[in-house]
């Protein structure tokens, strides 16, 4: 039996044991985990410091190091996220529909757990606890495989959760942690059809593509965000400037940060020079511009074709000038990763056309793409942002981690 087989078997057994946990029992456990995270924060910080030291030694960028870092505020935020999940309505057992058919059969469709969820993710250690809390709230066992960069932090966080489970008399195997960060083990998890009911990859384009190519278990694709801001010819340019600055600079290393700016030709001569000046007062951003934009920006560099398809996760932004709304929509649909896209305009009909025609999970009018988030959308913590169309799309909250089952009650009916 391989390492993944052992984890999978333990998770499968655990999933059956926790399947009938009551809402009260689940909420109590989650609140205990939240308390334990704060109480054991010194242990977590010690382990996180090891990851930070390794990151510095390995030349990982400051932006990516920020994703790794755990502070008192961030631990408090993670704990609060767990408490918020405890406060959310429990979807398990909810009736989706119920009716009596022509044969007199009483048919009820209810929400039920998936079973065993596996998650492969990169860098941000908070993901481990977010994923656990959502999986546990929906009576699912979860197998977590984080990246090498955050191995010590992830292990510490999962250790705290497992200890809380054990103290509550619940099997600690409800959350499994993959300590082997090799690609071989990750790929073995991708094909563990005997144990895994759903695999969720959360990370960069390379990870997502690998999972799409090699997975045999059901997958929900998440994460990659080549997000665009389109500044229309009818935009309020001051508003557009603030939206672009926020979407690009507030936290560039996350998937809902803007990576590409598309500007209508009618306002480009006024907008781009002013944007460049305004953003430079806050943060140095490298603009990689097409030929028309390049002439209007003092410090921009020429964009390569690849730049328009790149999720930079850095203070870098591609710039494209278009002559019409239709051209903007076609351009975005060519390069989008179907995550989050935005238009800035005062024209309602153009805004509606953009929202209808752009193919993305979240499409904004006059707002930053940075709002695509489970908490902001009122879903509680999210396990990821789905960029596909099957089963779940956009921020994935509790319902996305459930399946349904039909309960049919009869009185001796047979089919003629």
Swiss-Prot record:
In which pathway is this protein known to take part? Amino-acid biosynthesis; L-proline biosynthesis; L-glutamate 5-semialdehyde from L-glutamate: step 2/2
Record SUPFAM superfamilies: ALDH-like (SSF53720)
| UniProt xrefs under Pfam families | Aldedh
Tell me the Gene3D superfamilies matching this sequence: Aldehyde Dehydrogenase, Chain A, domain 1, Aldehyde Dehydrogenase, Chain A, domain 2
Reaction catalysis annotation: L-glutamate 5-semialdehyde + phosphate + NADP(+) = L-glutamyl 5-phosphate + NADPH + H(+)
GO terms, biological process: L-proline biosynthetic process
Entry-linked PANTHER family? DELTA-1-PYRROLINE-5-CARBOXYLATE SYNTHASE, GLUTAMATE SEMIALDEHYDE DEHYDROGENASE
Q: What does this protein do?
A: Catalyzes the NADPH-dependent reduction of L-glutamate 5-phosphate into L-glutamate 5-semialdehyde and phosphate. The product spontaneously undergoes cyclization to form 1-pyrroline-5-carboxylate.
Would you identify the family this protein belongs to, as annotated? Belongs to the gamma-glutamyl phosphate reductase family.
Name-wise, this protein is Gamma-glutamyl phosphate reductase
Organism the protein comes from = Streptococcus thermophilus
Q: What is the lineage of its organism?
A: Bacteria, Bacillati, Bacillota, Bacilli, Lactobacillales
């Amino acid at each position: 039996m391989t390492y993944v087989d052992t984890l999978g078997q333990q998770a499968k057994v655990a999933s059956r044991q926790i399947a009938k946990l009551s809402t009260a029992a689940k909420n109590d456990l989650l609140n205990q985990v939240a308390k334990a995270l704060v109480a054991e924060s010194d242990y977590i910080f010690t382990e996180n410091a090891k990851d930070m030291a390794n990151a510095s030694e390995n030349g990982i960028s400051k932006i990516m190091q920020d994703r790794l870092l755990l502070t008192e505020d961030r631990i408090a935020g993670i704990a609060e996220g767990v408490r918020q999940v405890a406060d959310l309505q429990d979807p398990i057992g909810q009736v989706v529909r119920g009716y009596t058919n022509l044969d007199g059969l009483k048919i009820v469709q209810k929400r039920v757990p998936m079973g065993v969820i596996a998650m492969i993710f990169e860098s941000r250690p908070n993901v481990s606890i977010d994923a656990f809390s959502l999986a546990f709230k929906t009576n699912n066992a979860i197998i977590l495989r984080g990246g090498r960069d955050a191995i010590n932090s992830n292990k510490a966080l999962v250790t705290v959760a497992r200890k809380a489970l054990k103290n509550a008399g619940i099997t600690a195997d409800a959350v499994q942690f993959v300590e082997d960060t090799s690609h071989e083990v990750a790929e073995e998890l991708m094909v563990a059809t005997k144990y895994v009911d759903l695999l969720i990859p959360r990370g960069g384009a390379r990870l997502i593509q690998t999972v799409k190519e090699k997975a045999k278990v059901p997958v929900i694709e998440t994460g990659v965000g080549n997000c665009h801001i389109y500044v229309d010819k009818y935009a309020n340019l001051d508003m557009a400037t603030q939206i672009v600055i926020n979407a690009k600079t507030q936290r560039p290393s996350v998937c809902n940060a803007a990576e590409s700016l598309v500007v209508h030709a009618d306002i480009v001569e006024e907008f781009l020079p002013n944007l460049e000046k305004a953003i430079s007062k806050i943060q140095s951003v490298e603009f990689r511009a097409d030929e028309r934009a390049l002439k209007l920006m003092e410090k921009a560099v020429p964009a390569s074709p690849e730049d328009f398809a790149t999720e930079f996760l850095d203070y870098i932004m591609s710039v494209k000038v278009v002559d019409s709304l239709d051209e903007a929509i076609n351009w975005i649909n060519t390069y989008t990763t179907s995550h989050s896209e935005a238009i800035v305009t005062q024209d309602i009909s153009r805004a509606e056309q953009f929202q209808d025609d752009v193919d993305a999970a979240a499409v904004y009018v006059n707002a930053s793409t940075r709002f695509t988030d489970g908490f902001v959308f009122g879903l509680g913590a999210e396990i990821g942002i789905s960029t596909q169309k099957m089963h779940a799309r956009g921020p994935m909250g509790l319902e996305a981690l459930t399946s349904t089952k039909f309960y049919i009650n009869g009185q001796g009916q047979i089919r003629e």
